[in-house]
Swiss-Prot record:
Gene symbol of the encoding locus: cyoE2
Membrane topology designation: Multi-pass membrane protein
Enzyme class: transferase
Identification of the protein by name: Protoheme IX farnesyltransferase 2
UniProt miscellaneous comment: Carbon 2 of the heme B porphyrin ring is defined according to the Fischer nomenclature.
Length: 310
């Protein structure tokens, strides 16, 4: 009896771990930081804790839903990749229908929280990001187009905008800058992953840039996107949304990241190692900027491009 109970307990723990894994906790955590950064930038020190908690929890559940459903969609290509071949949607440890229902439930709960506590614009951006990620990127673009990363970058840039618009209820220049900034950041971040996971993507026949058009072109794009990202990031302080601390941090991190990327042109470069370094510093960069803009906000007069409130 005790042996059976222990076995059941072990199976339950494994099942629980599987459900957690399909939500991709690392992605959720990264998005939490950017949502908080966008929210606190817009709040400018006047923080509504209930609204902030609702924005963080609601958006996290939406992201978790998208990731769970993405696992269902990607099960065939995940089976061909060393990094993902042991996911529960591939092994069958959890039935696919259960993961799908779990993802739908998370989405309903997440969107429900955003609808109840935030505003129509924040909810709209969350919905658009979700549709782009699940419906356009996962179902079609990732498998069929070299531009899949570009399309996916939009959904990856939505979380800080949701946080920002939860406070303002309007689409102003600050929100536009955040959307551009985080979209641009996604590109070198994703291309770096595609380089050090090249064999996986090639085996699954996913047409990411390094696989479809070669390493040389991917390196050019990484450098170009980092350079443009650096310029766009300075728009937050130049437009008066943040102060000198943010300007200093964005200049320092962007310059270091760009210098690191340029090392990819060396003849003796170890490509996988270099790509991992570019990827790793991309996380440091965006985390540093999210934290800094949350602390170094400025009280500026916001001119809305359009307003959509409850």
């Amino acid at each position: 009896m005790n042996t059976q109970a222990r076995l059941t307990s072990t199976q339950w723990k494994a099942r629980f771990k599987g459900y957690v894994q399909v939500t991709k906790p690392g992605i959720i955590f990264g998005n939490l930081i950017s949502v908080a950064g966008g929210f606190l930038l817009a709040a400018k020190g006047d923080v509504d804790l209930v609204l902030m908690l609702a924005s963080l929890v609601g958006l996290s559940l939406v992201v978790a839903s998208g990731c769970a459903i993405n696992n269902c969609i990607d099960r065939d290509i995940d089976a061909k990749m060393q990094r993902t071949c042991k996911r529960v949607t591939v092994t069958g440890e959890i039935p696919l229908s259960h993961v799908l229902l779990f993802g739908i439930a998370l989405g309903v709960l997440g969107f429900g929280i955003l609808a109840l506590f935030t505003n129509a614009l924040a909810l709209l951006f969350a919905a658009i990001g979700y549709v782009v990620y699940v419906g356009i990127y996962s179902l079609y673009m990732k498998r069929n187009s070299v531009y899949g990363t570009l399309v996916g970058s939009f959904s990856g840039a939505v979380p800080p905008v949701v946080g920002y618009c939860s406070v303002t209820g309007q689409m102003d220049m600050g929100a536009v800058i955040l959307l551009l900034m985080f979209s641009l950041w996604q590109m070198p971040h994703s291309y770096a992953i595609a380089i050090f996971r090249f064999n996986d993507y090639a085996a699954a026949k996913i047409p990411v840039l390094p696989v479809a058009e070669g390493m040389a072109k991917a390196k050019h794009h990484i450098v170009l996107y980092i350079a443009v990202f650096a310029l766009v990031s300075t728009m937050l302080p130049l437009a008066g949304y943040t102060g000198t601390a943010f300007m200093a941090v964005t200049c320092a991190t962007s310059l270091w990241w760009l210098t690191m990327a340029l090392k990819g042109y060396r003849q003796d470069v170890d490509m996988p190692r270099w790509a991992r370094q570019v990827f790793g510093f991309s996380i440091i960069t965006i985390t540093a900027l999210s934290v800094t803009m949350a602390l170094d906000f400025q009280a500026v007069s916001q001119t809305p491009l359009f307003t959509l409130v409850r």
